Curated annotation (Swiss-Prot):
PROSITE patterns: RIBOSOMAL_L34. It comes from the Bacteria. The lineage of its organism: Bacteria, Pseudomonadati, Chlorobiota, Chlorobiia, Chlorobiales. Keywords: Ribonucleoprotein, Ribosomal protein. This is Large ribosomal subunit protein bL34. It comes from Chlorobium luteolum (strain DSM 273 / BCRC 81028 / 2530) (Pelodictyon luteolum). Residues 1-19, 26-40 have a biased composition (Basic residues). Residues 1-53 are annotated as: Disordered. The gene is rpmH. One of its GO terms (biological process) is translation. GO terms for molecular function: structural constituent of ribosome.
Length: 53
C-alpha cells in the first residue's frame, strides 16, 4: 500500500506558495499574521529561493 504523503515541490509551491496566499483576502491575512509574529519564512515559496524552480 502506498503512503499518503508523496512529496512534490511543485505541488507544495502551488498549494501553499506566496502567490496563492497573496491572491486571496484570507491568504493575505495569513501572511500579515506571520509577519507580525516575526516568522523566519512567510510561505513555502519564500524559503525555496531560486533552487525550487
Amino acid at each position: 500500500m502506498k503512503r499518503t504523503f508523496q512529496p512534490s515541490n511543485r505541488k507544495r509551491r502551488n498549494k501553499h506558495g506566496f502567490r496563492l496566499r497573496m491572491s486571496t483576502k484570507n491568504g493575505r491575512k495569513i501572511l500579515s499574521a506571520r509577519r507580525a509574529k516575526g516568522r523566519h519564512s512567510l510561505s513555502v515559496s519564500s524559503e525555496m529561493g531560486t533552487a525550487g524552480k
